[in-house]
């Protein structure tokens, strides 16, 4: 979503935009979020770090354990989402660069109906929407990573033609 905000504001500096795990719901309006004081800075837990791995058999337990171990060491504080009302600026019609929309089939954050609306509202005809079969929100680390990489490179090659 940050990439989309940057693309909308500075399209002259962006060649194309890839959206993956895109959670925005069509016509959803974030309430004004003007927090006061310091963010809560809650610690990241092992359960939270592993929460994106939803589909059995798409990644080994050893890989999940290593991901969790490194996540806890590299980022011990959980993300504090603040000023979320700024996402109300997001509008597919304001994206003028080519877009690759990647959706994992079982990503609980990325809803097909919302993606359909987003894709329809993109004004640039240089756009592709790829659904990664048998994948969830962590597809770039799972068995679907090859398809994710192939879709990304195919999109880049397609733009060069």
Q: Which role fits each region the language model picked out?
A:
Residues 1-27:
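Conserved hydrolase catalytic core segment
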Residues 19-73:
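Hydrolase active-site cap/lid region
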Residues 26, 73-91:
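Active-site nucleophile elbow and catalytic-triad environment of alpha/beta-hydrolase enzymes
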Residues 88, 97, 111-120:
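Short alpha-helix in the alpha/beta-hydrolase fold that links the catalytic acid
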Residues 95, 101-103, 107:
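Short beta-strand/loop motif that positions the catalytic acidic residue
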Residues 106-110, 138-139:
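Acidic catalytic loop of the alpha/beta-hydrolase fold
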Residues 128-161:
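Catalytic active-site module of serine/aspartate enzymes centered on a nucleophile-bearing elbow/loop
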